[in-house]
């Protein structure tokens, strides 16, 4: 099942016991963050605060706080199904002409899914049931915008989908960026230089003679569009198209009142506005996904000129902090999308994992089917340059395919027994680094480490390599057969050695 809007999804969550309505008065200033954080850590439900102190609009939090709710939101039974969409993205990134009739037939499912990529235009959209366009009526602080952490400089919009379009690019880009609230009609948009919105703005700034860069921000879109906007995909592909792939149907959009941008038609709230060419301000500090307050930095200021919303709108929000948080849960799920794209370039990769403790992308664990001397080092350099977001990955660890990349016990065993620090570590200096990473000596520039934790072949070592201990299969089977008769008090299932 897929959902045309957020409200349908909320009804399903409530029916399945995955959403809790909270009528008790709670303050958007810090209190909701603490409640949502405790709930998320215990894998609890989504939360709908119906009585936020000082506001009449309810707040929805913790929407994608579990893998099961992400699966439900895009209508899949298992998160591994996202690899099928990843395969389609890999196909779109490097399409191949069918080599024959059989090959053509095998590609038909791809072509069918592609039919869901174009947008569907909707007139009289519900997101424009109420329109505020007089300057004196524009007041975004009427929304119950949260202050997440004690050291945050102000309240901030966290789940707004920012829609932009470059000067020459026909596709419209969707991205999730933090919006610091400056006043009733002004916000700061914090986007990193490599993200689609920033690239669109830079292209417009360079080539356009206009003074105002149009912006739209959608709050409370349908789950597929929310997830689609949160995932970094190739810049040539619109997130509207990607959302259609996730949903299995075209994304419904409607034209903005003040510009030619299109917004999700069933959104709860829409903010329309513009960025003046040289209007910038210092953003932050805010608590971030790293678990620290980020440093201050200058970013563009957006002036809001129009607010539209549904009748009785819902404000969708979240907090970011040290994992686990909602972005890290989403990152774990969306990890599956990248695997087919990476495997298309490096078929020898068996698994690719971004642990949530690595703050989304700072540490990657890769397992490979090793085929030649120095193979791990090839993969390390390849991953750093494979996709844009991986240029910020500080640590890449490569293991053999007998290691479970998602089991720290396995990974640490490989590091401890298969790696020599002097021989098997690569240090790359003066490389691009996330400016939020205060551990780097210069903002935006730092070092990276690649670790080869694979078994070493002759030529990579002069010593006889160790042979892993392994029990005979016949003995394992025998003990499995008699295990229950032994009556050993043990919560774990009988351990089975890897073949």
Swiss-Prot record:
An annotated GO BP: ubiquinone biosynthetic process
One MF annotation (Gene Ontology) recorded for this entry: 3-octaprenyl-4-hydroxybenzoate carboxy-lyase activity
Subcellular location: Cell membrane
Sites where the protein binds prenylated FMN: 176-178, 190-192, 195-196
Keywords: Cell membrane, Decarboxylase, Flavoprotein, FMN, Lyase, Manganese, Membrane, Metal-binding, Ubiquinone biosynthesis
SUPFAM superfamilies recorded: FMN-binding split barrel, UbiD C-terminal domain-like
Cited InterPro entries: UbiD, UbiD-like_C, UbiD-like_N, UbiD_bacteria, UbiD_Rift_dom
GO CC annotation, single: cytosol
Enzyme kind, highest EC tier: lyase
Catalytic activity: a 4-hydroxy-3-(all-trans-polyprenyl)benzoate + H(+) = a 2-(all-trans-polyprenyl)phenol + CO2
Membrane topology of the entry: Peripheral membrane protein
Cofactors demanded by this protein: prenylated FMN; Mn(2+)
Pathway given in the UniProt record: Cofactor biosynthesis; ubiquinone biosynthesis
Covalent S-S links between cysteines: none
Short name of one Pfam family: UbiD_N
EC number of the protein: 4.1.1.98
Functional note: Catalyzes the decarboxylation of 3-octaprenyl-4-hydroxy benzoate to 2-octaprenylphenol, an intermediate step in ubiquinone biosynthesis.
Protein name in UniProt: 3-octaprenyl-4-hydroxybenzoate carboxy-lyase
Species the sequence originates in: Blochmanniella floridana
């Amino acid at each position: 099942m897929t959902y045309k809007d957020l409200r349908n999804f909320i009804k399903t969550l409530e029916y399945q016991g995955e959403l809790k309505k909270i009528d008790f008065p709670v303050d958007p200033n810090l209190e909701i963050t603490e409640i949502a954080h405790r709930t998320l850590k215990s894998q609890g439900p989504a939360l709908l605060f119906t009585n936020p102190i000082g506001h009449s609009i309810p707040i929805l939090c913790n929407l994608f706080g579990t893998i099961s709710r992400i699966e439900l939101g895009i209508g899949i039974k298992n998160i591994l199904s996202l690899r099928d969409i990843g395969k389609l993205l890999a196909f779109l990134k490097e399409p191949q002409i069918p080599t024959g009739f059989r090959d053509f037939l095998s590609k038909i499912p791809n072509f069918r899914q592609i039919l869901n990529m174009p947008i569907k235009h909707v007139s009289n959209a519900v997101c424009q049931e109420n329109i505020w366009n007089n300057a004196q009526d524009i007041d975004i602080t009427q929304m119950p915008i949260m202050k997440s952490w004690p050291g945050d400089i102000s309240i901030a919009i966290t789940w707004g989908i920012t829609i932009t379009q470059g000067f020459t690019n026909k596709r419209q880009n969707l991205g999730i960026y933090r919006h610091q609230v400056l006043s009733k009609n002004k916000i700061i948009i914090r986007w990193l230089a490599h993200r689609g919105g920033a690239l669109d703005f830079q292209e417009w700034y360079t080539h356009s003679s206009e003074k105002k860069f149009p912006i739209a921000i959608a709050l409370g879109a349908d789950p597929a569009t929310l997830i689609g906007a949160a995932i970094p995909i190739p810049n040539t592909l619109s997130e509207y198209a990607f959302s259609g792939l996730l949903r299995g149907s075209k994304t419904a959009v409607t034209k903005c009142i003040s510009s030619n941008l299109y917004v999700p038609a069933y959104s709860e709230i829409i903010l329309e506005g513009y960025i003046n060419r040289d209007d910038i301000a210092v953003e932050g500090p805010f608590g971030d996904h790293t678990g620290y307050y980020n440093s201050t930095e200058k970013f563009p200021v957006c002036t809001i000129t129009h607010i539209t919303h549904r009748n009785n709108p819902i404000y969708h929000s979240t907090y970011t902090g040290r994992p686990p948080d909602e972005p890290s849960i989403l990152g774990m799920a969306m990890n599956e999308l990248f695997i087919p794209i990476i495997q298309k370039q490096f078929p020898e990769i068996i698994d690719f994992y971004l642990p949530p403790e690595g703050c989304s992308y700072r540490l990657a664990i890769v397992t490979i089917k090793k085929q030649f001397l120095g193979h791990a080092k090839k993969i390390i350099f390849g991953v750093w340059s494979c996709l844009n977001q991986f240029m910020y990955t500080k640590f890449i660890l490569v293991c053999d395919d007998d290691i479970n990349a998602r089991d720290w016990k396995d990974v640490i065993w490989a590091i401890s027994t298969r790696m020599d620090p002097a021989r098997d570590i690569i240090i790359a200096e003066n490389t691009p680094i996330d400016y939020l990473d205060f551990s780097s000596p210069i903002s935006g520039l730092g070092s990276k480490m690649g670790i080869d934790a694979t078994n070493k072949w002759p030529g990579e070592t002069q010593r006889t390599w160790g042979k892993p201990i392994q029990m005979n299969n016949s003995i394992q089977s025998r003990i499995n057969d008699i295990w229950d008769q032994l009556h050993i008090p043990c919560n774990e299932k009988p351990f089975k050695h890897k073949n």
